[in-house]
Amino acid sequence: MQTLSFLLALLFLVAQTPAQPTGEGEKGGTIQEPEATEAQDTAAVLMAAGAADGDDSDTKQLDTTFCRCRVSCNILEKYSGKCELSGRTARICCRKIK
């Protein structure tokens, strides 16, 4: 189930990433995009990781995981893979929301 959740998060990250301009047909230099800071999250994904185990079906709650592409993960976040942030390799940091 964790693998499926990770693949869904990765799919959403790829879908939300804007296409990079090739620069063909332009006279002059390349297009410069502003640098993203740690506070500016370029991708955020909310997903359901699965239902919590329990005897009573009425009391089951979904665990929700929040993932984003960052330079470094916070204390409560878990490293879940690599992503691209402003043309540089960054980390996918996830945390569970209850």
UniProtKB/Swiss-Prot annotation:
The keyword Transferase does not apply. Has antimicrobial activity. Residues 20-62, 97-98 form a propeptide. The keyword Disulfide bond applies. It comes from Ornithorhynchus anatinus. GO terms for cellular component: extracellular space. Residues 1-19 form the signal peptide. InterPro entries: Alpha-defensin (IPR016327), Alpha-defensin_C (IPR006081). Keywords: Antibiotic, Antimicrobial, Cleavage on pair of basic residues, Defensin, Disulfide bond, Secreted, Signal. Belongs to the alpha-defensin family. This is Defensin-A1. It comes from the Eukaryota. Its main location: secreted. It is found in: Secreted. Highly expressed in intestine, and expressed at lower levels in lung and spleen. GO terms for biological process: defense response to bacterium. Disulfide bonds join C67-C94, C69-C83, C73-C93.
